[in-house]
Amino acid sequence: MHLMYTLGPDGKRIYTLKKVTESGEITKSAHPARFSPDDKYSRQRVTLKKRFGLVPGQ
């Protein structure tokens, strides 16, 4: 079982172990993606995050 989440009405995460909520909404994984040193697109991803202000700490 993996920790999953869905967004509540106030925009905060509601954590669960279920894949689908009672209302039929599909949950998302609460775990980050695995890191790979062979990631070919990390430069583009970082550039886009900086451009749109999505990098934490800025």
From Swiss-Prot:
InterPro entries per UniProt: H/ACA_rnp_Nop10, H/ACA_rnp_Nop10_sf
Keywords: Isopeptide bond, Nucleus, Phosphoprotein, Ribonucleoprotein, Ribosome biogenesis, rRNA processing, Ubl conjugation
UniProt record similarity statement: Belongs to the NOP10 family.
The encoding gene: NOP10
Localization annotation: Nucleus, Nucleolus
Function: Non-catalytic component of the H/ACA small nucleolar ribonucleoprotein (H/ACA snoRNP), which catalyzes pseudouridylation of rRNA and is required for ribosome biogenesis. This involves the isomerization of uridine such that the ribose is subsequently attached to C5, instead of the normal N1. Pseudouridine ('psi') residues may serve to stabilize the conformation of rRNAs. The H/ACA snoRNP complex also mediates pseudouridylation of other types of RNAs. The H/ACA snoRNP complex mediates pseudouridylation at position 93 in U2 snRNA. Essential for growth.
Cystine connections: none
UniProt organism field: Saccharomyces cerevisiae (strain ATCC 204508 / S288c)
Quaternary structure, from the entry: Component of the small nucleolar ribonucleoprotein particles containing H/ACA-type snoRNAs (H/ACA snoRNPs). The protein component of the H/ACA snoRNP contains CBF5, GAR1, NHP2 and NOP10. The complex contains a stable core composed of CBF5 and NOP10, to which GAR1 and NHP2 subsequently bind.
Protein name according to UniProt: H/ACA ribonucleoprotein complex subunit NOP10
Broad class of the protein's primary localization: nucleus
